[in-house]
């Protein structure tokens, strides 16, 4: 039984190893979302620790979540779906599903913690970028930034504050754990 469990675990890593970080970076070269994707990847790695998952696996999902952004910009209902097609067989189905579910316009509802964590990380990255948040930051700075961002993007409050509250996460701590910047 233990051997079967280890084989199953190794199979999961082999699927995830279907694409290396270097290859993912090459796929993203020239993308308007290159730096955003790196930030989302780092946030996902930090979040993985809160949910007892493998940081590199969640980081890869964050890194590749907007791979099709430039291609699907005029057709947001396809955003995420095209990435899932490109990466089919190279990432686990759960990862591809999270990528499809991260944008509400795709029609794929988030159901797993990975789905919801990617939405959180994507929205938190947008908040950090738009509000030019630097680390270390305080809870006050972060909540002021959320308030400012919600004027143009009202969904940020639910996707960031709502998720953090439901999961018992301190947003400012997550931001500070991504490192200086």
Each model region followed by its residue ranges:
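Charged phosphate-binding loop/patch that engages nucleotide di/tri-phosphates or the phosphate backbone
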Residues: 164-181
């Amino acid at each position: 039984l233990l051997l079967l469990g280890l084989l199953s675990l190794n199979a999961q890593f082999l699927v995830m190893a279907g694409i290396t970080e270097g290859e993912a970076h090459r796929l993203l070269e020239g993308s308007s979302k290159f730096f955003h994707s790196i930030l989302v990847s780092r946030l996902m790695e930090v979040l993985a620790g809160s949910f007892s998952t493998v940081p590199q696996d969640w980081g890869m999902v964050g890194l590749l979540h907007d791979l099709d952004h430039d291609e699907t910009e005029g057709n947001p209902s396809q955003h995420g779906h095209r990435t899932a097609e490109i990466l089919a067989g190279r990432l686990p189905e759960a990862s591809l599903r999270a990528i499809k579910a991260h944008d509400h316009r795709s029609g794929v509802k988030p159901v797993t913690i990975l789905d919801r964590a990617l939405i959180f990380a994507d929205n938190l990255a947008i908040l950090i970028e738009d509000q030019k948040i630097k680390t270390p930051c305080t809870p006050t700075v972060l909540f002021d930034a959320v308030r400012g961002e919600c004027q143009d993007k009202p969904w940020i409050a639910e996707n960031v504050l709502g998720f953090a509250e439901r999961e018992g996460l301190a947003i400012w701590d997550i931001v500070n754990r991504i490192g200086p910047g």
